[in-house]
Amino acid sequence: PTIINGGVINSIQNTAKLGKSEWSILEADESDGSFVHIPPTYSIITNIDREHMDFYKSMDDLKNYFIQFIEKVPSFGKSFICIDDKINNDIVKKLKNQNFYTYGIHPNSNFLIKNIKHNKKFTEFDLMINLPNKKKEYIKKIKTPLLGIHNIRNSVAAVAVALTVGISIPEIKNGLLNFKGVQRRFNKIFSYNNIDFYDDYAHHPTEIKVVLEGVNKVYKGYDKVCIFQPHRISR
């Protein structure tokens, strides 16, 4: 597929790649509202936070942009919304178009994350799938080298889309297991004197909180130091 991403993808050492298939995968940028001009077939809404308020007039304005984006998805497509996020949960209730699935650790999720296990090398989880008018499905032992609950949620979003478009479970598991990640997304840079050094782009309070929660789960009992670089006065 053609790929356009906000960060450098480690496997291709670039933010973009021109593919040869009819598929395009891109990261939509909501910072200036331009994402509503993208015509998605499948969309993923990870979370919505009080950000980019230099452009949006209010939180209601921000929410309305996301509602507009979600409702642009055609009937032959689908939106995937993480309902662990409070604002996403509010938006779901306001959608006129019910053409979406939900995911997360929230018990009402269509793609429900179960049995999370953390270690330094991999995160493992199970996935219970409960879709309208379909038989329940349970996928065990999905592994990803990415750490933190936010990366599990992101992985599940990718799994949900992949299953919906007909990619097999073995292919999905293999793809996640071998995913090299994106630069500055909790990347391990090096180790020195038994100390591991990671780099992460998180600069919004919510993002920083989520990353640190992931670190605490993986490195229980270890001393941890966080060095924060302030970025933009609006954040």
Where are these regions (language model features)?
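Loop/turn-to-beta-strand initiation segments
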Residues: 1, 22-23
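Short beta-strand-centered segment that lines the nucleotide-binding/catalytic pocket of NTP-utilizing
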Residues: 1-11
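Cofactor-binding loop segments of dinucleotide-utilizing enzymes, especially the Rossmann-like FAD-
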Residues: 6, 82, 105, 228-231
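Conserved coil-to-alpha-helix start sites within the AMP-binding
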Residues: 29-38
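Active-site beta-alpha connecting loops in nucleotide-dependent enzymes
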Residues: 182, 206-235
